[in-house]
Design a protein with these regions (language model features):
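Lipid interaction determinants
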Residues: 6, 15-85, 89-152
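Bacterial N-terminal signal peptides that target proteins for export
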Residues: 1-5
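Repetitive helical segments and hydrophobic/amphipathic motifs
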Residues: 11-12
């Protein structure tokens, strides 16, 4: 009886060790609704800015990130230099980020002002797989990739 109990406990321990974190691709493919990607406050990394790759656009110190939490109507992240937060409103395919505040570190050469100006416009968004596109007047102005949390 003791051996059976020990065997069952060992099996239970092994089953409980299974990783619950999926890749960003699994996260994206498991979503029932595009807006659910915002409900869970997933982190997005900037991959292009105004038609240029993020690093070519001047984000050489740190890759900017964006987190949108629809449940709390909040946005936040990092501009490539400073951490920021603000209010986020998602209506249909429209995203508005407003009342942005940030830390005030100095970082030479980072196009942070332009990043904040673009982010604070009312933008249309689309999500294609793991890529979030923010557009203004039909032009893609920023693209973000769903950050793979398991890679850290």
């Amino acid at each position: 009886m003791k051996k059976l109990f020990v065997a069952l406990m060992a099996v239970a321990a092994l089953v409980s060790c299974k990783s619950t974190q999926g890749t960003s691709q699994e996260k994206a493919s498991n979503k029932q609704n595009i807006s659910e990607l915002f409900v869970e406050a997933n982190q997005w990394e900037l991959i292009s800015f105004n038609g240029q790759a993020a690093k070519e656009a001047g984000f050489t110190l740190k890759t900017p990130t964006l987190v949108i939490n629809m449940a709390e109507n909040k946005a936040g992240g990092n501009s490539g230099c400073n951490s920021f937060g603000g209010e986020a409103i998602v209506e249909g395919s429209t995203l508005t980020i407003d009342k942005v505040f940030s830390t005030k570190m100095y970082c030479d050469g980072v196009p942070e002002i332009e990043f904040f100006q673009m982010l604070q416009q009312t933008l249309n968004y689309t999500i294609k797989g793991e890529v979030l596109q923010l557009t203004k007047d039909g032009q893609v102005i920023m693209e973000f990739k769903l950050k793979d949390e398991s890679a850290e």
